[in-house]
Amino acid sequence: MQAIETRDAPTAAGHYSQAIVHNGVVYVAGQLPIDPKSSDRTVGSIEQQTERTLRNVEAILVAAGSGLDQVLQMTIYVSDIELWGGVNTTYARVMGAHRPARAVVPVKDLHYGYQIEIQAIAASK
């Protein structure tokens, strides 16, 4: 197993790695829409939060030698299912033609008042 840490995504805030690579698979820990450069925790629109979170996932995947086009499955936690339209539109734009398996999990609350958290599993290139 290899732990992945990159400055291009938010530093892990607890006892975990940003990702683990094992047997050619990258397991990305749940990511929030925190700006890795400034650690800014400003909550923007759901579209802004979704894009920032996906970019954090992407940065970790790249550090692991993978990318969004190698994602096998994503789990998206959203604080209000009514936000799904904005999440899905942004997700489709960022992911492009690649359509990995996906689960959407409505939850009551997420850290720091955010409305989205994304976890991913990807193949390494």
Predicted regions and their residues:
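Short, polar/acidic, helix-capping and beta-turn segments at strand->helix junctions
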Residues: M1-K125
